[in-house]
Amino acid sequence: MKYLLVEPKVKSIAPNIALMKWATWCERNNHEFEYVKGNIRPSIQPDVILMSCIFSFYSRKYGETIRHYRNLFPKAKIIVGGAFPSNMPEWFEQFPYVEIHHGLSEEIESLPPKYSIDKKNKKIITYASRGCVNKCGYCTVPKLEGDMKSFQSIKETLEYGLKEIPDATGVVLYDNNFTAHEYFDNIVDELRDFGLPVDIHGLHVSDFTEHHAQRFAELKWGAQHENGTAYNRFSFDFVGYEKHVKRALELSEKYKIKAGFFCYLLFNWKDSPHDFWKRIILSQRMVDEVGRTVFLFPQRFEPLNSLERNNYIGDKWNDDLVRGVVKLYTFMHGFIPLTTTRNIFRWIGYSYEEFLDNVIKFSTVRGYRLNKKSGEPPSTDSLY
């Protein structure tokens, strides 16, 4: 059998781990395979086409890719998997020749990814767990992956990854909630002993304890970015998380974890602009009290069934406010850095009224970004 592994050409910050695992499956079962990205003409004549579809708002691109390969190989079996078809199988009914794979395959999940199919990737990217203990209303994980399943060891995957990428620069875990991992200590031991810089996604502030901080201090951080920048990624999605966020920040400083403190700020969901602004202010207060920089990354909410990106406006928001917030953090190169100097607030606003005023003005301007040489934002005079 010949398998064509298709990754649609959409914006992505990481290689497609699912297709890498399928490549390993093909190799171990003596099936010929080819991995492609985008709508091209592959070198093989496939019997089966496996396609990964993650985000619903790329539906148009996915449709184009399905039609492209159907036209090239009308006799091939087409199977699509991922979050989008698992959440919205009805959308794929327009393609009666397409078979949908729902959720995760235990057989495939147990395999290490074949990293070498992506020649540009230099990181060992994997999971130490799937699923999550939480059931957040804005997240697809509970439906796609189910209850949390912790893997007792990732040593085999790490060693396999190093064989695939001898010059690997780091290890990245894309877990949803690593702080709730059943075998947390064992995984940290393996990461520490492996020796490469690490980056771990999915750290929940409500689960973060002194023990987590102590163990994280043992790790070498900085796998995600080529310049060695490292972050511990938390989220501050609701004002009620304040005490948890502050506790995590205090522990990070106490144990001198060598990674920046990074917080996602969900907005445009059930929150209001005032709620969003208040989380920024509360974060700054924590910075002042603890003395550790916090990097805020606003995350615009997208409904799980959205077929187009950036069209949804929350009940308590409007288009100008959402667009202004997006431009505000885009102009700061993607995040809002909070330091004890408070310099950033002359750009954001020192009161809620100033914040609203600046956000509305940001929604109408173009071309401003943080000055890379000086590290200072442009004068707010240029926005008036």
Question: What is each stretch, according to the model?
Answer:
Residues 221-384:
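A structural motif corresponding to the C-terminal lobe/cap of the Radical SAM core domain
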Residues 71-77, 196, 257-259, 292:
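A short helix->loop->beta-strand "cap" motif at the edges of active sites that frequently abuts
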Residues 46-50, 98, 137, 169, ...:
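Conserved acidic residues
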Residues 26, 132, 136, 173, ...:
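Conserved, mostly hydrophobic/aromatic
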Residues 2-123:
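Glycine-rich beta-alpha loop elements in corrinoid/cobalamin-binding modules
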Residues 5, 154-269:
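Conserved SAM/AdoMet-binding glycine-rich loop
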Residues 17-18, 119-160:
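Canonical Radical SAM [4Fe-4S] cluster-binding loop centered on the CxxxCxxC motif
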Residues 22, 61-69, 157, 186-187, ...:
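A general structural detector for well-ordered alpha-helical segments in enzyme core domains, enriched
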